[in-house]
Amino acid sequence: MTVRLAEPSVPSRRFHGTPTLFDLSLSENPFPPLPSVVAAVRDTLAAANRYPEFLPERLPRLIAERLGVLPDEVVVGAGATGVAMQILRALGGGEIVSSTPTFDGYPIMAEMAGMPLVSVPLDAAGQQDLAALRRAVHRRTALVVLCRPHNPTGTVLDAAAVRGFLAAIPRRVPVLLDEAYAEFLDPADRLDVDGLLRRHANLLVLRTFSKAYGLAGLRIGYCVGRGELIARVRGQQLPFGTPAAAAAAVRACYAADDELRARVGHIRREREALRMSLRACGIDAPVSQANFLYLPGPGVATALRRAGIKAKPYPDGSARITVGDPTAGLAVHTALAGLRG
């Protein structure tokens, strides 16, 4: 499978007026928030006339207790993208080295921060090319970005390869490990984040409550790091920028582990069932450990749009689709069943 450079997509006039039956473009969780989470958020609204904390303390403390790190090693913000933007501003210039295609927020944020983006193509298997990324690092490099699982392919770098890569990067160069979809990983593929942070003071780990926890609309993200680097990121936090609802929602999510694990398990099963059904139709989707599938082109994005399915399209006709809704999965299968003859 070859994955090519992603460009900003422009809606085709051919599909003007085609109704969108399923929006599978943003890797959203198909489940609404749990009732206990909704209730916890609703309870905070009675005090909506009051300002939240000047700088967040309750939310970082909750997350730190969960991860087994110190509260001052956690920085929170408006989703993973909000925290990533804080990181770029904290670095104050230089180049960003990242794979391509990747989460399309990184090119946008790099431009906003005035930081040139050095893009390294994925290898033929849809994996991030660690050797090529290492070669791209030089004296002007301010940040290296890894995604695990990768967006848009869902592929996962081997843990030993990640450890070797971190050891090979100069200590002066921060590495951002984007784990937005970490909760969907097989247990055996999960990293020892605390151990990595102890060994690598230049590491930042980025996560979100938008995906597995289904709180995309509340914009709750965080990163974990050590020492002077995480302190610089914390210095970019917006005063009064974290509403009380965020800590209430996270506390309720953590209290509902079993229910949330069941939802993640459902999404994982639906993902694999859809992947196998599409493979039987000639669509060679790579094994994914996220809540989406990458469907190689040509013609996939067009066939989906024609069927009223909004996906994340790529220039070669490939597409990324959210998984988890069985009805949407059936619509995807129907739209693509005859594409490969």
Segments predicted by a language model, with ranges:
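N-terminal "arm"/small-domain region of PLP-dependent enzymes with the aminotransferase-like
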Residues: 1-50, 65
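PLP-dependent aminotransferase class I/II
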Residues: 34, 202-279, 283-286
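Phosphate-binding glycine-rich loop
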Residues: 56-95, 113
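PLP-dependent aminotransferase-like
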Residues: 89-146
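Active-site pre-lysine segment of PLP-dependent enzymes
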Residues: 111, 128-139, 152-175, 179-215
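Short beta-strands and strand-loop turn motifs
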Residues: 114, 118-121, 143-150, 175-179, ...
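PLP-dependent enzyme catalytic core of the Aspartate aminotransferase-like
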Residues: 160, 307, 312, 316-341
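Conserved PLP-binding catalytic core of the aspartate aminotransferase-like
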Residues: 267-268, 272-307, 323-325
